[in-house]
A protein has these predicted regions:
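Regulatory input/activation interfaces that engage signals or partners
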Residues: 4-10, 17-156, 162, 172
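Two-component transmitter module helix at the DHp-CA junction of histidine kinases
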Residues: 44, 175, 179-185, 234, ...
């Protein structure tokens, strides 16, 4: 989906400097706001959105937008409508349908302009918000889970191949920056050995009832552990807790009951 373009060393150094800086404004989820603001300036756009999405469970575990709330009113109706039409949008569902999270994509990679304007996603979300152009970068976050960085523009020129090439070169550094941010957060939210036992079992796909049997406790106790875990990790769902606690997917290989054995 890319064609050869020239990216200046100065542009690349600037972007790498943005991602590589150790920043103090680390939010409860996502990337530092100052980092996102500088990315928006370097790849000119009207708005930028960075969020984590679980397509299997139809949830987001965080969402950052610059300007804040530009294209998302946060309503349950809007969120439900998004998922109703999500899989019909070739451009939006491409990473989940194909497993390709490396490509930097735009809607016009998949549609003609006329076709794009006739889609439900454009009609229900893009057009009402004044969005004509989008460019998307994805990072893997587990099965059917992606972290997405979206750049938006209104009427005018689409994103260029230079813009796409810059994001392609930036992508591995952004991925490392996001992992580093997750590690920094996890170190500030201490969990007990029992909390880690529960989290490993949740990550393995066990229900509360199965976890209760495995740990020889009641389901009510498991629920209480999860409440405490959510509070310490500053999240509100199982998916978000797993993503926060295991930013590199380490839960898939870590021994579930290691804490008890020690």
């Amino acid at each position: 989906m890319t064609s050869p373009v020239t990216v200046s060393e100065r542009d690349l150094r600037t972007l790498l400097g943005i991602v590589g800086d150790h920043r103090s404004d680390l939010p409860p989820a996502g990337l530092p706001w100052s980092l996102l603001a500088e990315l928006k300036d370097q790849i000119p756009c009207d708005a930028l959105e960075f969020f984590g999405q679980d397509a299997d469970h139809q949830v987001e575990w965080f969402n950052q937008g610059i300007p804040a709330g530009s294209y998302d009113d946060g309503s349950d109706f809007q969120f439900q409508l998004y998922w109703e039409i999500y899989w019909d949008s070739i451009a939006c569902a491409y990473p989940d349908r194909t497993g390709d999270v490396r490509s930097i994509t735009k809607p016009l990679d998949f549609y003609s302009a006329r076709q794009w304007h006739s889609t439900a996603m454009y009609s229900e979300f893009f057009r009402p918000a004044g969005i004509e152009h989008e460019m998307m970068l994805c990072l893997p976050a587990g099965p059917m889970r992606t972290v997405r960085l979206l750049f938006f523009r209104g009427v005018g020129p689409d994103f260029s191949e230079r813009d796409r090439a810059l994001l392609m070169l930036l992508r591995p550094h952004l991925q490392q920056g996001y992992r580093d941010a997750e590690r920094r957060r996890s170190s500030t939210f201490p969990l007990t050995p029992r909390h880690w036992e529960v989290l490993h079992l949740v990550a393995a796909g066990h229900t509360n009832a199965q976890i209760a049997r495995r740990l020889d406790v009641t389901e009510k106790t498991v629920g209480k552990h999860l409440e405490n875990i959510y509070a310490r990790l500053q999240v509100s769902s199982r998916t978000a807790a797993i993503t926060r606690a295991f930013p590199d997917g380490a839960a898939q290989t870590a021994p579930v009951l290691q804490a008890r054995a020690n």
